[in-house]
């Protein structure tokens, strides 16, 4: 696990481009070498300020993902699991459209359910 030393801020969120995202742990960008990231539930936000406020709440502070799509910021509470099987099962239980594989090449990291 690699965790950035710096917490993100509104500027970091504002600098996301369409289709880009971040995974956060305690407000800091994080990457893993293995495992799968699965969202359990989430919220849509329209401004970077809304996102910054949300990720400081107890519900989203520990682990969450942010991504920008067509000017909407999606903020999801997420869980990292070890296997694809566990990720698919949890993703389907939580009505998710996809899961994210950490150990995969960036162009194949997203698996649609």
Enumerate the predicted regions with their spans:
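Conserved, structured core segments of small domains
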Residues: 1-113
């Amino acid at each position: 696990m690699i965790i950035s030393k710096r917490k993100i801020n509104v500027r970091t969120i504002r600098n996301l481009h369409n289709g880009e995202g971040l995974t956060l742990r305690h407000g800091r960008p994080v990457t893993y070498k293995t495992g799968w990231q699965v969202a359990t539930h989430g919220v849509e936000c329209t401004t970077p300020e809304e996102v910054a406020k949300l990720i400081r709440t107890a519900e989203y502070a520990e682990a969450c993902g942010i991504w920008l799509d067509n000017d909407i910021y999606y903020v999801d509470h997420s869980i990292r699991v070890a296997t694809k099987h566990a990720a698919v099962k949890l993703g389907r239980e939580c009505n998710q459209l996809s899961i994210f594989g950490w150990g995969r090449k960036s162009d194949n990291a997203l698996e649609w359910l």
